[in-house]
Amino acid sequence: MNESFDKDFSNHTPMMQQYLKLKAQHPEILLFYRMGDFYELFYDDAKRASQLLDISLTKRGASAGEPIPMAGIPHHAVENYLAKLVNQGESVAICEQIGDPATSKGPVERKVVRIVTPGTISDEALLQERQDNLLAAIWQDGKGYGYATLDISSGRFRLSEPADRETMAAELQRTNPAELLYAEDFAEMALIEGRRGLRRRPLWEFEIDTARQQLNLQFGTRDLVGFGVENASRGLCAAGCLLQYVKDTQRTSLPHIRSITMERQQDSIIMDAATRRNLEITQNLAGGVENTLAAVLDCTVTPMGSRMLKRWLHMPVRNTDILRERQQTIGALQDTVSELQPVLRQVGDLERILARLALRTARPRDLARMRHAFQQLPELHAQLETVDSAPVQALRKKMGDFAEPRDLLERAIIDAPPVLVRDGGVIAPGYHEELDEWRALADGATDYLDRLEIRERERTGLDTLKVGYNAVHGYYIQISRGQSHLAPINYVRRQTLKNAERYIIPELKEYEDKVLTSKGKALALEKQLYDELFDLLLPHLADLQQSANALAELDVLVNLAERAWTLNYTCPTFTDKPGIRITEGRHPVVEQVLNEPFIANPLNLSPQRRMLIITGPNMGGKSTYMRQTALIALLAYIGSYVPAQNVEIGPIDRIFTRVGAADDLASGRSTFMVEMTETANILHNATENSLVLMDEIGRGTSTYDGLSLAWACAENLANKIKALTLFATHYFELTQLPEKMEGVANVHLDALEHGDTIAFMHSVQDGAASKSYGLAVAALAGVPKEVIKRARQKLRELESISPNAAATQVDGTQMSLLAAPEETSPAVEALENLDPDSLTPRQALEWIYRLKSLV
């Protein structure tokens, strides 16, 4: 049965009618329907869940004459199953029993209390602690895109307005949302196809007036001018849809979402999707996290610090005042790293705990962790007090001390609370007098039972008599089978065992009712007091969020100070002059994974030396040299120290890489097509302040086509765009470029060849390489010896036919394309314009004489 089409529920049982009505409100997502200690799924949901979760598919009786497919999960294990579903991009509506079964006529009242979606989760068990979990919305009109992201676990709300498809693709790559909302008429489906968590939304949710109204209502403002987003209509359309979706799914107020920020391209270094992928910033080319820049740089001690560092890495800032401030802070903190990090580690993930507090889903252990974080603040304040740095003191001030909330939680919550409030024992003794009284009554049962047992033994003279309790039958008096015939007349039999009889007496029954009532009252009061704690803590929310942000930033900066010291990094110098000058530069990741010492190399790019043509053997280190330059620039522009002896760096607006390629089979694009698409993006968007890495342009096509393209690209970058360019190539003909244009220089990575073996020197030298060592590298890779031998024969043949094929000279026919374009011969022009079919024999003879004179 497909319940989405069956709107007539009258043939079904009352319980299934209730289920189907709730399911009709959430047709696209799974419905977890609470029945006692289980969440049940029925019909199509049950079939899907059994496949997604690998749980048994059973049947539950029949309704409307058909057996009902059913699958269920225990309520106490729901978080594990939700995590599995969310990781697969599924959303789930959680339906709880809100009525009392004892007083309900017919099915117990139920309602959907929350909707769990990949982009709106805040539960600790469902989130990866060191990664942001973003919900995003995308909007498109004739002028460009609107894009909004929200991290519900921190309240961070951002919007941007990418102007074109490439910029939009780069934003999707950078933010990597867990869930993406798009309009039902979204035109560029190819841009988002294959992404996880896609959600199609109706057009009206993106309506601009509704968006402004929703946002003003959320922030308690009359307009959005104060946020700097008033005129960002495309971005606001996306933000409005996103906020509406969050309200629909969370079904509670969102006090931690207090502002929205515009992300402008001119504020950060722009990197397209290919560049982020090629530089392996937070994800390697295989999709893992090993051997990435973040893996080397991230030794933060709090999850919120780790997430902030990754945001910095993906959005390097161009404001050198901010960068110099970060550098100064890192320098000032280097002497206190060993004292600060152990204390910061105890702060934990305050940012996400605060989000759960705002959503009123924080659990007792969240509040205990929050208390523990507050308890670290005095020591952090004391340690930072002596640091002579204005930025550090500003962070110290933002951290606050929160003595009042700390005192409240120390009084209210026991040291090691249980997981859930409903388990009881969360509120500390002494916090509330009435609660203590109910607990005393419930807990005083042991003393009473001991006294009752002694009294009844003496009264009856039965030495086997004892008083006990179990969860099924409650309190009882037990007498052995041998003495049971002596039980007094007022003993009412409650249970018969193999060797004993159990009884109840009116006094014990009355006490049992009182104890059970007191336990229930204690639990109800405890729940009420717990909810009141939220009301007492929430007025501090804005200051607490500021504190969490300051603590995360402190963690990042202390981490960068530790990394700089441990990895021997240096503080780069920013200059207004264009260019990059690096002394003894190293690749931050490669140097960590190598078993032998890394060979450091210099680099000098300036307006007078804008392009380096890099030649040398495969495996010689060309790609490493290029990538290390980009990574050093990237690290400098997050304010970090860098792996080099000395670095001076000028303004950079974009980093481009055209490094390596693979077929994009899903889009039907070959390696060469991918390569040319990325190259076109660079040639259209690079400026004189861009850093461009071009590796092996033109290798995916024929030699002459590839060489022609590589030459023309290099010429365009050096002469027209004037970008700072590293251009690696195996076309030795390109080493003649420095002779033909200004601002271009040759460098090479050397190797030594001895017989069939080759030693890579990995050091960068001025000038062009003498040869490519391709056969030696092939031998090293294990190509069979007979193939290498045949290749050497063929190479000698080719070199004898065209001595220039493997040399750096550019004479002869192969390099004619590099000479100035020749003027067309008059004789050729005349022949091209000639129509031989229209000539008489006499005219043909005259033409021969005329052509002879033109040659």
From Swiss-Prot:
The keyword Cell membrane does not apply. Pfam families: MutS_I, MutS_II, MutS_III, MutS_IV, MutS_V. GO terms for molecular function: ATP binding; ATP-dependent DNA damage sensor activity; damaged DNA binding; mismatched DNA binding. One of its GO terms (cellular component) is cytosol. SUPFAM superfamilies: DNA repair protein MutS, domain I (SSF55271), DNA repair protein MutS, domain II (SSF53150), DNA repair protein MutS, domain III (SSF48334), P-loop containing nucleoside triphosphate hydrolases (SSF52540). Keywords: ATP-binding, DNA damage, DNA repair, DNA-binding, Nucleotide-binding. It comes from Salmonella paratyphi C (strain RKS4594). Belongs to the DNA mismatch repair MutS family. ATP binds at residues 616-623. GO terms for biological process: mismatch repair. It comes from the Bacteria. This is DNA mismatch repair protein MutS. The gene is mutS. InterPro entries: DNA_mismatch_repair_MutS, DNA_mismatch_repair_MutS-lik_N, DNA_mismatch_repair_MutS/MSH, DNA_mismatch_repair_MutS_C, DNA_mismatch_repair_MutS_clamp, DNA_mismatch_repair_MutS_core, DNA_mismatch_repair_MutS_N, DNA_mismatch_repair_MutS_sf. This protein is involved in the repair of mismatches in DNA. It is possible that it carries out the mismatch recognition step. This protein has a weak ATPase activity.
